Amino acid sequence: MTFIPVNEPLLNGNEKKYLCECIDTGWISSEGPFVKEFEQKVSEASGRKYGIAVANGTAALEVAVQALGIREGDEVIMPTFTIISCAMAVTKVGAVPVLVDSDIHTWNMDVDEIEAKITPKTKAVMIVHLYGLPVETDNILALAKKYDLKVIEDAAEMHGQTYNGKPCGSFGDISTFSFYPNKHITTGEGGMVVTDNEELAERCRHLRNLCFKKDVRYVHDEISDNYRFTNLQAAVGLAQLERLDEFVKKKREMGRYYSNELRNIKGLILPIERTDYAENIYWVYGILLDRDIKSDNKTLQKLLAEEGIGSRTFFWCMHEQPVYQKQGMFAGETYPNAEYLARKGFYIPSGLALTQEQMEYVVCKVKKIMTQLY
């Protein structure tokens, strides 16, 4: 069997048709009509009034943080176990990420740790939903109300997911999405900020476009970046969005298959299928090695690659990132659950283009490897 990538998107809908329309009409830049349509449809799908498309998910977080007025010296509470984009969006403006550990069962941030981390400098909490299951959001919203904090919801991996029946992306002051190729819907690269606040939405649009002064071209009233999103990207995104329900269904079927086949393998801890508030949509199919196994996720990655199977290790913790350690940040901080996830967690091929034959091969080789390790 040829090499099985960890992710491959499904691009056999209207993507080519809409892209050809862009090329035929000449609308390929950020001014094209597909951009506004994509913004409208994503915001509607996420239960929001306004959508602002940007270059990628990292840009979406940066715009969200800046739009909320978070600045130097402010503190933002977030999980240590996440992608570095979350922390970078905060440190870029001179603010300070304040970290919490992970819930070992859901792999999301431990909500019970948040209140103890709130100080007079705390300005916001960043909710980060990971690997297909949402964070227990109600408790965070209650804390935000109690302490008058802003809430940023990173829903990058949550296209089509709900929390207690409400769409992920609909919570807090502002939410963000990513459209990287490993997401349920992709635009190649891309992201979006969604909100119900008209002033915040206008602020995000301003930040997206180099902060051009209103109605005066090439005059700028503050420093920003070019975070614009093209009509070509939006064309792909619209075609993808048309099939979101189908994609979520396929991901859940994939997750159930893997769980049924791997649940009795000694040494493996599999993702939770459902909680009281959500059913897993398996952004990726993550697996955790038992603590008794001496090997780490990098060993598994190497062994799977030898069998022609792509895989990825879990995120590395923010408090252990060299870039922050060099700056003296998070000195002496430890988060045992997150550290365990980062060292023992990995995910196997789970892209939308994955075939049944490929899944069966992956299962066979995972069983073989675990027999060798345990």
Regions found by a protein language model. Give the residues of each.
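Active-site PLP attachment segment
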Residues: 170-209, 231
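Histidine-centered beta-alpha loop that forms part of the nucleotide-sugar donor binding/catalytic region
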Residues: 81, 95, 102, 156-157, ...
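PLP-dependent aminotransferase-like
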Residues: 66-155, 162
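Conserved active-site segment immediately N-terminal to the catalytic lysine
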Residues: 153-187, 216-221, 269
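Phosphate-binding glycine-rich loop
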Residues: 28-75, 88-93, 99-101, 166
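PLP-dependent aminotransferase class I/II
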Residues: 36-41, 45-49, 112, 116, ...
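Structural detector of well-ordered beta-strand residues that form the stable sheet scaffold
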Residues: 52, 77, 98, 151-152, ...
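N-terminal "arm"/small-domain region of PLP-dependent enzymes with the aminotransferase-like
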Residues: 1-28, 349
